[in-house]
Amino acid sequence: ASQKRPSQRHGSKYLATASTMDHARHGFLPRHRDTGILDSIGRFFGSDRAAPKRGSGKDSHHAARTTHYGSLPQKSQRSQDENPVVHFFKNIVTPRTPPPSQGKGRGLSLSRFSWGAEGQKPGFGYGGRADYKSKGFKGAHDAQGTLSKIFKLGGRDSRSGSPMARR
């Protein structure tokens, strides 16, 4: 019996650390597409495994936060949806969105953005998102300007420049 007890205790400890690691890991990697599902699973298991006082309190807070931040970016998503040009520029500027999602359509990239914000959870999800919007906007314009400059300089000027130099 004495042997059984420590192993049990050890098991619970291990499970607890696993759930915490799961949380940390899932928060750390915003590349997961199923963050919502993972979070709900983590919350379920966390409250199940870890001490109910700790687990449920922490995890319910997490869940509330997640939904909160999840809902906020979706609101900004609608405005993005209304403005496809902004959406397009944002997709170009942000390296996080791979081209396939661009090609597949707005729905996919929309969900991608929302999970991205969810991954950034700690309070920056929303702040960073808003910042991104303004930054991305300016960045898109800047990028456009510099791109057109580069293309004009590199493309036309070098072409028209080298024959002129030859002449």
Swiss-Prot record:
Entries under InterPro entries matching the protein? Myelin_BP (IPR000548)
Could you tell me the Gene Ontology terms of the biological process aspect for this record? myelination
Q: Which GO terms describe its cellular component?
A: compact myelin; internode region of axon; neuronal cell body; plasma membrane
> Which controlled-vocabulary keywords does the entry list?
Acetylation, Autoimmune encephalomyelitis, Cell membrane, Citrullination, Membrane, Methylation, Phosphoprotein
Question: Annotated Gene Ontology MF terms?
Answer: structural constituent of myelin sheath
Name the site position(s) for Cleavage: 89-90, 113-114
**What processing steps or modifications follow its translation?**
At least 5 charge isomers; C1 (the most cationic, least modified, and most abundant form), C2, C3, C4 and C5 (the least cationic form); are produced as a result of optional post-translational modifications such as phosphorylation of serine or threonine residues, deamidation of glutamine or asparagine residues, citrullination and methylation of arginine residues. C1 and C2 are unphosphorylated, C3 and C4 are monophosphorylated and C5 is phosphorylated at two positions.
For this chain, the annotated S-S bridges are: none
Q: Where is this region: Induces experimental autoimmune encephalomyelitis (EAE) 1?
A: 45-87
Q: Does the keyword Cell inner membrane apply?
A: no
Main localization (coarse): membrane
Annotated region (Disordered) at 46-114, 136-167
PTM annotation (Citrulline): residues? 25, 31, 129, 156, 167
Tissue distribution is: Found in both the central and the peripheral nervous system.
According to the UniProt record, list the residues that bear N6-acetyllysine.
Answer: 121
Q: Which residues carry this modification: Phosphotyrosine?
A: 14, 69
Q: Where is this region: Induces experimental autoimmune encephalomyelitis (EAE) 2?
A: 114-122
Give residue numbers for the modification (N-acetylalanine). 1
Q: Which residues carry this modification: Symmetric dimethylarginine?
A: 106
Omega-N-methylarginine: residues bearing it? 43, 49, 106
Q: How does it assemble?
A: Homodimer.
* Family (UniProt): Belongs to the myelin basic protein family.
Described purpose of this protein according to its UniProt entry: Is, with PLP, the most abundant protein component of the myelin membrane in the CNS. Has a role in both the formation and stabilization of this compact multilayer arrangement of bilayers. Each splice variant and charge isomer may have a specialized function in the assembly of an optimized, biochemically functional myelin membrane.
What is this protein called in UniProt?
Myelin basic protein
Origin organism is Cavia porcellus (Guinea pig)
